[in-house]
Amino acid sequence: MSEINPTYMVNRQARGDERRLHILRAAWQVIINDGIRGVRHRAVAEAADVPLASTTYYFRDIQALINESMELFAQETFQNFTEPFWAEAEAKFATLKAAENRQLLEQGFVDLGVDYIHGRLADHRDQLVLEYAFWHAAVNNPALRDAVGELLRRSVALMKPWFEALELSDPEQASRCMLATVRRIEYEGLIAGVMTQRPNWIREALTYQLKALW
């Protein structure tokens, strides 16, 4: 009996992992086009351009495919978009904090929020649609709630230092309130279209909410 080449086994495993991830990401496109209910083995196979047998081989249970696809999306969104954006914001935050000027700090926060929201609506609309589908699915899917909760906790942790610097009485609650406002603005932008709103509507909404936190 011939021995199995270890390199062959490693390469085979790598190809399997790559195809599995490809299928998970293909489910994102199905969700963008047809919503969560559109996720079926055949639809995902067509989006991934793989045989139907591949989707059923890696994900016999369609709910497991949905769950893992959404968990991967949450992880990659935070790593590839949210975290890098806030990492760049830290340098700006450090400069504004050193100035010890509350008005400048408030203005800097609003500027940052406008850039963040406008960028998501104008340049990352599909990603935003997926994110809202993810949140909606978690309402009726306990398996997704931990991932949603972790995403929320990470977002609060990134925003909280700004409100600590502004010396608000409850920086964590302030962060949650501001995140709720951000989501409301994003949802309005998705429904109505970011470019159809009046100029400065995002800035006005963020400024109003920031003043309400005092």
State each model region's role.
Residues 22, 26-34, 80, 130, ...:
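Solvent-exposed, amphipathic alpha-helical segments
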Residues 145-153, 162-214:
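Hydrophobic/aromatic-rich alpha-helical bundle segments in the mid-to-C-terminal region
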Residues 121-132, 136-166, 176:
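Amphipathic alpha-helical packing segments from all-alpha helical-bundle domains
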Residues 16, 70, 74, 145-153:
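Amphipathic, non-transmembrane alpha-helical scaffold segments
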Residues 22, 26, 30-68, 72:
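Helix-turn-helix
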Residues 64-94:
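Conserved alpha-helical segments that form or flank metal/cofactor-binding pockets of metalloenzymes
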Residues 82-124, 178:
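Hydrophobic alpha-helical connector segments
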Residues 1-18, 29, 89-93:
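N-terminal intrinsically disordered/low-complexity leader segments
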